[in-house]
Each structure stands twice: as C-alpha cells, then as structure tokens.
C-alpha cells in the first residue's frame, strides 16, 4: 500500500465516443489535453433516496442510492495549435460544445483585390461560409497579416470572392495567401466525450458520456493569458488502478503557446473598441433520457437549448452615446476579436485565436469604471440570424 500521489503528476485524455455512453480509452498520446491545474475536478455522484419510515424512533433508516451522474470542470488555455491549420489539442471539447467544425485549406488568391474583397479561383470559395474567420498572409508580400470574419461569399461565375468585415489599410496584394485554419460554430449532433483523468498518474478515473453544459472564455484582458473553461455533465463514471496507455503528447512540446492579450483588437461591427476586458459565456441545456433497464439510470442526453452571452467594458466616449442607443433601440451589431503570437517579425501573426458573434443585442448597460475612468459595463447576448450562426471560434 502506498500513499502520496502528487496532483500535478496526473494527466487528462479526451476522446470522442463512437457510441454515446460507451467508454472510449485514449487512442494516442495526442489525445492528452494540457489542462490548467487549478479548477480541474470531476465529481461522481449517486442520487440519494431517503426513506421516511416510522420505526418507533426519530432516527433515520439507511438511505438507498439511485441514478449515477458525473460532473466535471476542465479549465484550459485559449490557444491554437503549434502550426498553422493544426487542430488545437482541446478540439474535442470545442466540438462537443458547439457541434460544427470546418477545416479550411490554405488558398492563394487571384488579383485586383480591394481592402475587403479577395477574388479566388472558381470553386475555392466554396469551403468558406459567412462567419468564418480568416487570416490574410499579407506579411509574405508586404505589410501586416490581417484577420477578419467573412461577411459575404460570392460564387458568381467569374467573380468568385469573399468579403471581409474589417477593411485592410490598402488593397490586398495580388496572389496573397489565405491561411489554413480550424473553425467551430454551432451545429446539432454534438459528440459525447470520454474523459480519462489519471490521478497522480496511478489512478484511472473515467468520466463517460460527457457533454459541456457551459463554457466561458475568460481572462481576455489587457496583458493576460486568455482561458477557456468547460463544465461537463455525463452518464456514468468509474475509478480503477491504472496508468496512461500512452505518453501524453502536448501542443506545447511543438511550440504552441497561449497569446498574451496585447495588440489584440476587438471590434463592434468594423469599428475598433477601446476596452480592458471581455468575457463570453456558452450554455447548453441538457435533457437526459433514462431507462429502468440501465444500471446507471441515464442512457443518453440531448442538447435542448443553446445560449451565448458576453460582457464588455469599453471606455465611455465623451462625444457620443452610440452604445446606449444600441441598447435603447435594441439594434443588432457584431462583436469580433482576436489575439495572436508572432513569427519572425511582428508583421507575421501566428497561432491566432479569434471569436465572432454576428448578431448581438444589449439587454443591460450600466456605468462602471476602471481605476476611476468611466466605462459602459455591457451585458450582451448573441443570436442566430439569416445566414449566420450565433458564434464562430477560429484557430489559425
């Protein structure tokens, strides 16, 4: 018998399940996720069934236990893969949260571009959709790499193109490249996950049939490292003695790092906002299917509602009340932001992370302050509209 398991000697592996509720062990070292140590937890429970029996005493009789449940929190850094177009090592969590995933290939554009429109070889525009966030590799020719959401895809013969939300400072160069990337957006049919948490590297804890019920993009604040934390619920659990089947292989070993939130612009529509912090919350409402034939009680789950909210605190302008008017008139607008690391120069943006909410509303606005400087403290909501999903996340 031994004691003294060390917390940070543990590792976490995440796999999509082929069949919901059937445990999927790790298939490779790349299934490991480099999670944050603080806040990581899994809580197995059984429903307590109290027995209110009269037994000639006020003492209670032994309770029984019913349905099994598993809840967990997986905090992570909000970062891209080491190389352009790579999936982030936590891609399974994002796919389980949102459902939709597109892997975009690098494209070389044609000529005669504008500050927002890029012309493409016919057919190459078809991989894009409204809301995808792209990086134009302008630094390879002359200038600074440019990151923006797509607001229009045109497949008209002879003028196949994509149009960007945020204009570049001048017309894009001929034959400029558009980066490969991985994009996530909401789509039904999200996979369930098996999460294996190795406690101290010696005890195998299994969380089975897990779905994210909520997530939060936090710490997107001046000079900080952004984080994405996932809260999950599932169908079943188990714990046994066991060591990892594979040595963990982390993105950081290949050079992936979270960006520092500096030179990280946030836009309302195509207008840059001056703010100190931003957060985005995701909520999946789950409905569980149960069966008397199941030994754990729950047999499946479904996402019955998806909601996105955000908070921003732009500094209050001294010559307009535009944000208050958006609140008063319930007018829609978009929010887009990104952060990145750098390549050989600060013109070359690498390991870009970005978010885009095309259709936002402000149900609540108050007056706040940052070190005594007035701000508009905004609680907003994001919604789907014609041709757009509620939110897009991009890793470039």
Could you tell me what each predicted segment is?
Residues 1-396:
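Signature of extracytoplasmic/envelope-associated structural regions
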């Amino acid at each position: 018998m031994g004691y003294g398991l060390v917390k940070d000697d543990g590792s976490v592996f995440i796999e999509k399940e082929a069949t919901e509720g059937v445990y999927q062990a790790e298939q490779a070292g790349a299934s490991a996720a480099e999670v944050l140590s603080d806040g990581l937890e899994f809580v197995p429970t059984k429903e307590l069934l109290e027995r209110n029996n009269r037994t000639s005493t006020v003492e209670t009789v032994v309770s029984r236990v019913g349905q099994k449940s598993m809840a967990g929190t997986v905090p992570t850094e909000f970062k891209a893969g080491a190389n352009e177009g790579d999936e982030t090592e936590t891609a399974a969590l994002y796919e389980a949260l949102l459902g939709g995933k597109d892997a975009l290939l690098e494209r070389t554009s044609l000529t005669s571009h504008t500050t927002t429109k890029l012309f493409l070889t016919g057919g190459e525009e078809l991989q894009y959709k409204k809301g995808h966030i792209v990086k134009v590799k302008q630094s390879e020719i002359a200038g600074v790499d440019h990151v923006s959401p797509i607001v229009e895809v045109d497949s008209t013969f002879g003028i196949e193109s994509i149009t960007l939300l945020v204009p570049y400072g001048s017309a894009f160069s001929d034959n400029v490249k558009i980066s490969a990337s991985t994009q996530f957006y909401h789509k039904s049919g999200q996979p369930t996950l098996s999460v294996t948490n190795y406690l101290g590297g010696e005890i195998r804890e299994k969380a089975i049939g897990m779905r994210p019920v909520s997530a939060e993009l936090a710490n997107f604040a001046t000079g900080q490292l952004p984080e994405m934390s996932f809260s999950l619920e599932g169908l079943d659990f188990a714990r046994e003695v066991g060591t990892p089947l594979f040595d963990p292989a982390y993105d950081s070993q290949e050079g992936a790092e979270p960006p520092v939130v500096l030179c990280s612009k946030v836009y309302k529509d195509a207008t840059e906002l001056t703010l100190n912090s931003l957060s985005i919350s995701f909520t999946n409402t789950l409905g569980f299917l149960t069966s008397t034939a199941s030994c754990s009680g729950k047999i499946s789950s479904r996402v019955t509602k998806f909601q996105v909210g955000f908070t921003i605190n732009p500094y209050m302008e001294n010559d307009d009340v535009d944000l208050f008017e958006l609140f008063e008139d319930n007018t829609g607008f978009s929010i887009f932001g990104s952060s990145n690391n750098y390549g050989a120069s600060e013109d070359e943006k690498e390991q870009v992370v970005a978010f885009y909410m095309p259709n936002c509303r402000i149900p609540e606005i108050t007056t706040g302050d940052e070190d005594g400087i007035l701000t508009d403290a905004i609680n907003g909501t994001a919604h789907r509209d014609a041709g757009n999903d509620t939110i897009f996340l991009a890793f470039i």
